[in-house]
Amino acid sequence: LPGHHRVAEMDDEENVPKPAIRDVRKVNESTLCVTFSDDTKCHFNSVWLRDSCTCTACVHPATRQKLLNSVKIDPNIQPLSWAVEGGETLEVCWPQSTSSPPHSSHYSCDWLYQFAKLFETKDGDPPEVSDMFYTNTKSSTILWNRDEFDENPPELEYKTFMEERSGLKQMVKNLVKYGISVLHGVPPHEDELEKVAARMGYIRETGYGQTFDVRYNADPKTHLSYTGAGFSHHTDLAYRERAPGVQLLHCLKAADPAKCGQEAGGKSFFVDGFYAAQWLRYNYPEHFKILSTTPVMFSFLDAERERWFREAWPVISVDYMGKLKDIHYSLFSMRPPLLPQDKVATYYEALRLFAQRVERTTLQYSFYLSPGDLVVMNNRRILHGRTAYDPTKVDRHLKGCYMDLDELKSLYEKMRKDDAL
């Protein structure tokens, strides 16, 4: 699969000479063209350059919040002068109000060069920039299937996670890279879930409260997950205005399949939705485009509170650069898309291709949850579910909660930065 491994630690090319600024010239009233030592050229808009200044007058040195008011920049601004310092820095002098002296901005060659690669990209995946204002550097995801986790599962011990900094870092690294991490040896007590969440950040409360229980409930109005029915691949709460980024599930009770027979069911499975989406993108690009541009309604009746929740998302979401961002997938809350009738068949064909790939056993990381297991997963990347089980044979009780994904991503970024100091 192209793009299968995007390991952030290997993103620095060795033995490649650093670029230098060779020439800067004015192309027109609003544009400077920078030529680099490898003959790369890039056009930079003057308003964009002025807005990108990071001096202490434009960006607060401690909080890194912008002090420069973007909307007050003259849309017709032109540089008064510019100079290149040793091929490494471009200095540009900008006009200000009549009562203020010109403003001087400095842009490093490395900084300009990475945007040159981004702005001039015509085909393929655009490169990431390493500017902290735009991206969590060193955060590339690693796509996976069952074979990868058979050899190296993203698992660690509860004691290591709770007591050692390296354990905490491994947990959030697994989540950022693979979208999933599994703790073993968590005490099977109801309050342990909140302790695990607090070790990383804050619980996100939902209509189910701070935490919720997943266990058999004979009430016919109950959620499907509270029955013994099979629960197919899905992401949670796609019908909310913003589906939670992270889900935690702590197993408090589970029958031993060796004692009750595996036919009793209740086996959990997890699939990398990004892997399936990337496969679709490379093998069926038109179908990928359909699933990434067609909003579909997700809706759910909270029978206990008698409230409907509705939100529309494409099954596959990409960011402004075309990179995979989110998966929203839940066949029991997805409604038929509202499309012109001549486009319906192709939509369902695209959905079928994605579903068939997701359901392949070669993509599934599956196991029987045991008391003391706790799964942490990216809820907008990892599709999860379970096989049907017989509630007369299997006493199954999971405790769950949600968190915000950016809390954990920012924690990992900080820990990496601290380790580099």
Mark where each language-model region is.
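Active-site environment of non-heme Fe oxygenases that use a 2-His-1-carboxylate facial triad
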Residues: T135-I180, H184-L421
